[in-house]
């Protein structure tokens, strides 16, 4: 093979033929010159051997032949290109036909126009390929019989006086940027693309070569625009041994043999993944011993619960510390629904007063500090404007202790007096889970029995990990469980420093080193807890495996003050004759959707009679019980009763709208 410029060699290279061995023949360089290429040094001298292992398209330069102007395109450019047979454009169809040779082989002629062609029958868009099949005469006027090169194959008769400009093109469908670059027949051809500002362009791709040098273990990145001539000597250099760089992901996929002694060639750039001491040893030239895949392959991401700056950890499935469950905290009713599991009761206590937005639906309940609830299921009700509102159906529990309440449920479950209430999913509040569990779990049992996230406290350290930091925190939040393969690795110079590396997030480039590892047997002690950097933690939480549920529904827009006062005044006027007025006209009452809420007996007594005096008064909501417990539409008598009761609840217009607490 004759020496060729590096750019020409790469442009005609078949990626499937890699790797290729090149010899540097000549180039523009001085004695001892060094090309700094993306952090890798490469001194190219005459006679150097380069083994090209990978070629990546960096960008494509488009050149306008008429003016020499250039434009850079990204490799993901989505425009379509069509090859042109010449650089000449034709003003009319007659000029195009006249330029063709006068023989039978000139038909058909493929062409296109850079302007729209408007006819009585249709409109031909710009850059639409056309096939000119023949010239016909109708009523003394010469027409070109053309067919659109498309699915419709519409037949057109265009007069030869039709103005363009027109361009001849090859009979092929438009192709993408990668298709054009991969076709050797289209190399250096003039192309047209509707997405570009010029009628014709020439593509000049630029590549980045990844290669290794003979007698050097470093990886070299060489741009194809480097002014150097090379010669392909792959066939005559089979006996020459090159170092073979590997990524940890390739070592993991290869499956061994293990242990494998390697030397680090390159460490990926970017923010740190782990904050462990062994990270500082991962640098170029460091020798590692790889023992194979870690077991088990699943991990748990956790964050500390403390008033100070939170810290983030990744726990191995082999973690042997003992954990106790802690009460979970919820800030919305939507979070309560997400934590509800089939077959597992969820009981919470309200830690602040919550208003259920009775203006949107009178059935929404008011919660006071200390209210105990049991989450039952989700449901739907109709709002005042007729829209569907997602709700959480809960059961208000009495103030008895959990053990006494369980005994009552076993003895007289049906007779116990409990009230069902509705909470809109958008309700913002503060709830704490009731936990009566003193068991000590290991990580395997805890993740098998309870869904994550989960609040825990590490009560016993992992005895194999003396520096276990998790026991020092008052609480730990187990965020999610991930399944990711890790490699067990140790420093060749310090076999006792053993750790696990995830190739997906820390894909080191290594080369197999000569010699046996200092420790052949698999290490027994591996740190089961690794601290994560804050940047990596948040990037990890964005992975598809950790995508959370859809955000909670937004609360309805609040009405203006004037509109509220008008509604109050209209309700007051309508309450003069409660037995006659129709509530839907002045204060429309929403109806529960029977398909989502179960029917219960109607003769339930009010649970407020059981509330102790020292508790804060709740807002009375006489319709909640009837609406929740009844599945049938309200009768006229019930509507009248509601109007009568509501008339007593209307505020006095002379009084302030605020509710002041008496001191």
Swiss-Prot record:
Changing residue 555 to A: Drastic decrease in GRB2-binding, but no effect on VAV-binding. Partial loss of enhancement of LPS-induced TNF production. The modification Phosphothreonine is found at residue 596. Disruption phenotype: Homozygous knockout mice for Themis2 are viable and produced at the expected ratio. Mice show normal B cell development, activation, or Ab responses. Residues 238-515 are annotated as: CABIT 2. It is found in: Nucleus; Cytoplasm. Residues 559-577, 621-641 have a biased composition (Polar residues). The modification Phosphotyrosine is found at residue 660. Induction: Up-regulated by pro-inflammatory stimuli, such as IFNG (at protein level). Down-regulated by anti-inflammatory stimuli, such as TGFB1 and dexamethasone (at protein level). Expressed in both developing and mature B-cells with high expression in immature, follicular and B1 B cells. Also expressed in macrophages and dendritic cells. Down-regulated in splenocytes of mice developing arthritis in a collagen-induced model, not in those of mice failing to develop the disease. Transiently down-regulated in splenocytes of mice infected with influenza virus. The keyword Cytoplasm applies. PANTHER family: CABIT DOMAIN-CONTAINING PROTEIN, PROTEIN THEMIS2. Interacts with VAV1. Interacts with LAT. Interacts constitutively with GRB2, LYN and PLCG2; these interactions increase the activation of PLCG2 and its downstream pathways following B cell receptor stimulation. Belongs to the themis family. This is Protein THEMIS2. It comes from Mus musculus. The gene is Themis2.
């Amino acid at each position: 093979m004759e020496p060729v410029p590096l750019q020409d060699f790469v442009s005609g290279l078949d990626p499937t033929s890699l790797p290729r061995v090149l010899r540097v023949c000549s180039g523009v360089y001085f004695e001892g010159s060094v090309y700094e290429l993306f952090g890798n040094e490469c001194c190219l001298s005459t006679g150097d051997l380069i083994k090209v292992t990978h070629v990546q398209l960096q960008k494509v330069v488009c050149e306008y032949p008429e003016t020499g102007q250039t434009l850079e395109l990204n490799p993901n450019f989505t425009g379509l290109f069509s090859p042109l047979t010449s650089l000449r454009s034709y003003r009319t169809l007659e000029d195009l036909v006249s330029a063709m040779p006068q023989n039978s082989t000139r038909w058909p002629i493929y062409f296109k126009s850079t302007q729209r062609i408007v006819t009585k029958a249709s409109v031909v868009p710009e850059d639409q390929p056309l096939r000119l099949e023949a010239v016909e005469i109708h009523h003394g006027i010469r027409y070109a019989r053309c067919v659109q090169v498309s699915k419709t194959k519409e037949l057109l008769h265009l007069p030869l006086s039709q103005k363009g400009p027109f361009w001849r093109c090859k009979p092929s469908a438009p192709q993408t940027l990668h298709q054009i670059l991969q076709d050797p027949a289209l190399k250096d051809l003039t192309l047209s693309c509707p997405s570009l500002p010029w009628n014709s362009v020439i593509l000049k791709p630029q590549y980045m070569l990844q290669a290794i040098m003979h007698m050097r273990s470093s990886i070299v990145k060489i741009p194809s625009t480097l002014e150097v001539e090379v010669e392909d000597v792959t066939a005559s250099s089979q006996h020459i041994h090159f170092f073979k760089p590997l990524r940890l992901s390739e070592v993991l996929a290869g499956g061994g043999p293990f242990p494998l002694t390697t030397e680090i060639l390159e460490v990926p750039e970017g923010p740190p993944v782990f904050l462990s001491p062994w990270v500082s040893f991962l640098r170029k030239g460091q020798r590692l011993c790889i023992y194979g895949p870690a077991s088990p392959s699943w991990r748990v991401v956790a964050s500390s619960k403390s008033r100070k700056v939170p810290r983030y950890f990744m726990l191995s499935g082999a973690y042997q510390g003992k954990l106790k469950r802690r009460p979970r905290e919820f800030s919305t009713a939507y979070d309560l629904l997400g934590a509800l599991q089939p077959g597992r009761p969820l009981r919470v206590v309200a830690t602040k007063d919550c208003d259920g937005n009775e203006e949107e639906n009178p059935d929404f309940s008011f919660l006071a500090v200390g209210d105990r609830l049991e989450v039952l299921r989700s449901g739907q009700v109709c709002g005042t404007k007729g829209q569907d509102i997602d709700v959480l159906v809960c059961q208000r529990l009495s103030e008895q202790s959990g053990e006494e309440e369980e005994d009552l449920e076993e003895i007289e479950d049906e007779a116990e007096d409990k009230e069902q209430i509705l909470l809109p999913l958008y309700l913002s509040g503060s709830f704490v889970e009731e936990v009566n569990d003193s068991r000590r779990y290991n990580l395997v049992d805890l993740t098998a029995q309870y869904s994550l996230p989960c609040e825990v406290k590490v009560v016993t350290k992992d005895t194999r990990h003396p520096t276990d930091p998790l026991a020092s925190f008052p609480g730990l939040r187990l965020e999610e469980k991930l399944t990711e393969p890790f490699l067990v690795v140790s420093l060749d110079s310090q076999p006792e420093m053993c750790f696990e590396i995830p190739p997906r997030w820390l894909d080191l480039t290594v080369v197999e080193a000569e010699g046996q590892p200092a420790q052949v047997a698999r290490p027994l002690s591996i740190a089961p807890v690794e601290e994560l950097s804050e940047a990596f933690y948040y990037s990890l939480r964005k992975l598809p495996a950790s995508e959370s549920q859809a955000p909670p529904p937004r609360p309805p827009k609040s009405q203006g003050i004037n509109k509220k006062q008008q509604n109050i005044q209209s309700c007051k006027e309508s309450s003069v004759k409660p037995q006659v007025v129709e509530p839907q006209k002045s204060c429309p009452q929403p109806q529960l959707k029977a398909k989502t809420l179960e029917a219960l007996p109607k003769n339930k007594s009010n649970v407020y009679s059981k509330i102790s005096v020292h508790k804060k008064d709740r807002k009375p909501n006489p319709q909640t019980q009837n609406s929740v417990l009844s599945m049938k539409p309200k009768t006229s008598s019930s509507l009248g009763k509601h109007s009568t009761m509501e008339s007593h609840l209307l505020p006095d217009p002379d009084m302030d709208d605020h509710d002041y607490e008496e001191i």
